Amino acid sequence: KVVRIWGKNVEIKMYEKLGAKPTTIVLRYSDSTIDMLTKTRYHKYINEKIKDMDLPIMVDDENEKSDIFYESAMNYLRKYANAHRDSEQRVYQDLKEYNFWRNLYGCKWIAIIMDAFIAVRELCLIDNFNVRDMFLNMYPTYVMFVFMMICIMLMCIVVNKNIVKQRAFEYAKSLAEVCERFVEV
């Protein structure tokens, strides 16, 4: 639960930096995640199928109030996808992946510090530390130390803001695609 809270803090900062939720951004004509023709088709579908919805159909129709409708439309699609998890498995999978990377990024520094403590502990337990032996005779003396160093490198290199942002937009895109499959309201 603590890690989820840290992940949600990351999410809030990301939204502030982006200026909106990725689920809102992908419906904007200024965003290229979804091509213009598909986006216009999605806007038309949403306007037809969701009561009282008025998404802009052309680029020139978009204004500062459009985000309110985009967010409302995506909230509807999210509720629909959650209620139909059996048929919307991709959306659910993308959501789980986004949540995983968001939460992992949220606890990144704690994980690195813990891995570093374990690596230092292992280093202290090794008699006559030798870099040559670490590569040539790794097992069993150096295995845990090398493993912790690899974990630290992976956390530093792979777990970053870009992967969280990428997963957020993948989820947003798959959620937007739901509008082609949902039933009339």
What are the functions of these language-model segments?
Residues 1-11:
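Transmembrane alpha-helices and immediately adjacent membrane-cytoplasm interface residues
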Residues 2-3, 108, 116, 150:
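Hydrophobic, lipid-facing residues on alpha-helical transmembrane segments of integral membrane proteins
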Residues 11-90:
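Charge-rich cytosolic interhelical loops and cytosolic tails of multi-pass membrane proteins
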Residues 56-138:
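Membrane-proximal, non-transmembrane alpha-helical segments
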Residues 137-138, 153-185:
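Cytosolic/matrix-facing juxtamembrane and C-terminal tails of multi-pass cellular membrane proteins
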Residues 144-156:
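Short acidic, glycine/tyrosine-flanked loop/strand segments centered on an H-E-D-like triad
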